[in-house]
Design a protein with these regions (language model features):
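N-terminal secretory/targeting leader peptides
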Residues: 2-25, 31-129, 137-370
Length: 370
């Protein structure tokens, strides 16, 4: 990696850093005189009610407008206003819209390698993922793969570690998973099905009713702040953790390759900086909102439970069997997978003696002070 390339990646990752701010301020007068007016449409995979996820892409669009002196405008549409949420990538590929804000793992069916744009089960937390994408070669590897789908990808948000879901009954061992009707999809659904779970694909707006009626036994959504809004605590009191299938899930912007190529270099830089700022904005906002939401949920009757050790151990084992099998059959998946796993293992080696040690100590102190 050259010093120039490294600097560009840092500026894109430095979310609102002084260098980016200074550069944009100096460029503004020239842009106002010479820059073309560009109007794009962006379709999101989320409803407006998910105000932190949807709010992040609104924030990104606002920043692009500010940085370009309103010369580059992105109009944001919620899921269903142009296309359904799960068709966002298709709309970008075929040119219906210039870009979308989505979770890449929704498109696992197109090619399993899409999963790396969000996360894989037992993956990396948000900070580790940023390190991998910006400085571990992850983003370059993913965008090399994305070219065949006529898109490029910019990380633009992270929910941080998610919860393990709401359950109508307690999970005491791996045996309790057998026959469990669990609203969960994608790669995690495939893994859990091998342990006897019956995965269910249900839209977010239908989860509450399905739990209430007993159509499903459990459901995962996001985390305390978003889960509280949907009222799950009223119909399923056991709230499990951790959400091992989404340790640090990134959401991001797919841009049509032809549209990306047509952007002036300054506009590309603005979009990269705005997306990186949105990445930090979403993660920080969830960190601010989730603790208080969790307290309220516990006050409303939620029973916090950790998945039993045999459940986690079985999920870990099956996860790597599934991923290794996919890698053996899909060269594009394997190329990213090998890089990802090597980086993940190094990250946890360091975290074990740095963050984890300190976090564990502080958690024990907090418990003692109660």
């Amino acid at each position: 990696m050259t010093k120039t390339t490294d600097r560009r990646k840092f500026l894109a990752a430095a979310t609102g850093g002084s260098a980016a701010i200074a550069a944009s301020s100096m460029a503004a007068p020239a842009l106002a005189q010479a820059a073309p007016e560009v109007s794009w449409r962006l379709t999101a995979s989320w409803p407006k009610s998910l105000d932190t996820i949807f709010g992040a892409v609104e924030f990104m669009a606002k920043r692009v407008a500010e940085l370009s002196d309103n010369k580059f405008k992105i109009q944001v549409f919620a899921a269903g206003e142009i296309v359904p949420g799960l068709q966002a990538l298709d709309a970008v590929q075929n040119g219906t819209v210039e870009c979308c804000h989505t979770s890449p793992f929704y498109y696992y069916g197109k090619n399993p390698a899409f999963a790396f744009g969000t996360d894989i089960p037992f993956g990396m937390n948000a900070r580790m993922r940023n390190a991998w994408m910006y400085f571990g070669g992850g983003l370059d590897l993913m965008n090399e793969f994305h070219k065949e789908f006529n898109v490029t990808y910019l990380p633009a948000g992270n929910t941080n570690a998610q919860m393990g879901g709401w359950f109508r009954k307690e999970i005491k061992s791996i045996e309790d998973l057998k026959g469990l009707k669990f609203r969960i999809g994608g790669l995690a659904g495939t893994i859990l099905s091998k342990l006897g779970v019956v995965p269910q694909q249900i839209a977010g707006g239908d989860i509450y009713t399905s739990l209430e009626r007993g159509t499903i036994d459990a459901a995962e959504w996001v985390g305390p702040y978003d889960d509280e809004k949907l009222g799950f605590v009223k119909v399923a009191k056991y709230y499990y953790y951790p959400g091992w299938w989404e340790v640090g899930p990134t959401v991001g912007v797919f841009v049509n390759l032809e549209k990306w190529a047509s952007l002036p270099p300054a506009y590309k830089a603005m979009l990269q900086v705005a997306a990186a700022e949105a990445n930090q904005w979403m993660s920080a906002k969830y960190d601010a909102l989730n603790p208080q939401a969790l307290k309220r949920l516990i006050g409303a009757g939620a029973q916090l439970r950790a998945f039993p050790p045999d459940v986690i151990e079985s999920c870990w084992k099956v996860t790597h069997e599934v991923l290794d099998d996919v890698a053996s059959k899909n060269a594009k998946f394997k190329k990213i997978y090998d890089n990802f796993i090597a980086f993940r293992n190094d990250q946890y080696l360091y975290t074990q003696v740095a963050d984890l040690a300190m976090d564990s100590y502080m958690a024990r102190l907090r418990a003692q002070q109660k």
